Structure formats: structure tokens, C-alpha cells
Amino acid sequence: TMAGNIFNVLIVHPALPAPSVKALIALARARPGELNYGSSGTGAADHLSAELFQVMTKTKMVHVPYKGGPLAMIDLISGNLQLMFSTVPTAVGLIKGGKVRAMAITNSIRYPLMPELPTVAEAGIPGFAVNNWTGVFVPAATPPAVVTRLNAEFVKVLAMPEVKKRLIDNGIAAVSNTPQQFAAYIRDET
């Protein structure tokens, strides 16, 4: 069962002279190879988000991989990095505190607790969408009746208003689907 979609955000150092995604693209094109971005490691979702951004915008920036997102975030706050992609839960306190500036949500929909923040697609890169998700798995040999029961219980829990609120407050939109839908989604994405 898919349990939720995790919201991600493009964030920049507050001093970066680009007030919008379009301005960031223009700056990166004007200064190829001069802007840098951090990631939690080579091949991680935030790294791949930045690579997709570069491909879709025909820009070139320097990748600075770290051994974890918190180390990259420290360098973004200190100004050693210009930008990075992050999960909303990791970045929201820093955004609210003015330590970093949010430019856009990478998901295909806006984050409900920051409705003023456009998606990257809305901000100037049509078709850009990076959606991370979380789900519940069981061993392949689990009896179908057990899978059905577990799914029903997870769907009930995910439908509870207090659970939905707790998830969205932490940057996750609750999703309830069937095991078959989840399996099809995974097949389609891989």
C-alpha cells in the first residue's frame, strides 16, 4: 500500500540574486558551471532532481555531493552552496526562519501548507515533477487474506483526520490505494 507522497522543495541561499525559478534559470545560463548545488549524495533523489532540472533547463551547475542532507544544508545556510533540492520536512523550519529561500515545490501539486509556493512546472519548467513516496511492503509469500486485511487497516488509519493532519504537517500527503494499484505504480515507475 502506498502510504504517502513526500513533498520536496527547491531552496536557495537568501543572497542568491534570483527571485524566481525563471530568474534562477537565466542566472545559471548566464554563468554556466559557476553555480553549485548540494545533495545528500551521488544518485540520491535530491541529486537526481537537480540533474533533471539541468537537463530540462539546458543549464550546467556544479554538483557537490555530501554524506547526508544535513551536511549539505549547513553549507547552503552558510553560503557555500547556492541551491539544493530537499524534502519539505527538512527545510520548512529553515524557510520560515529565513535561513533559506523556497523557490518551488518539485511535486506535481502544491504543498497545502505553503499554497503560495508554485510547483517547478508552474514556475517555468513545464513537465517537471519529482514525487517521492513511501509505502508499506510485506514479504512476497504473505497470504492474500493477510495482505487484504493489512491494506484495509492501513487505509482506515490513513483516512483518519488526525493522521492526515500529522502527515501533511510533516510534508507528506496521505495516499490510500490497493496492493494491486501500488504494484502497478511501482512497475510503471521502474
Annotated model-derived regions:
Residues 1-190:
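Conserved, function-defining micro-sites of small-solute handling proteins
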